Amino acid sequence: PIFMTRSMRDAGGTRAVGKALQHLSLRMTDSYQRIRPLHGFALGLARYAPEITRHNAFALCFELEENNFYPQSFLQLRVKDLCLESELSERLTDR
């Protein structure tokens, strides 16, 4: 299943990654910091890194996946799409 959440913010550590810095590695929490930071990965969405690291709220669609990075295993979000909260209503009406 694909999930959607809103009002997420950078929890420190979000950055562009990949050979051409085109992907986004996220460390995020909700706007009220009620949840522990989550890790996520977004292919081709590094263009959002500057706005996210300025703590602008964002929404995302994602799948859950298990990351097996020896010796640990943890859940991470495989981000399918992402947008800033300020763009969300416009993007929803376009569909």
Locations of the language-model features?
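Acidic, two-metal ion nucleic-acid-processing modules in DNA metabolism proteins
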Residues: 1-95
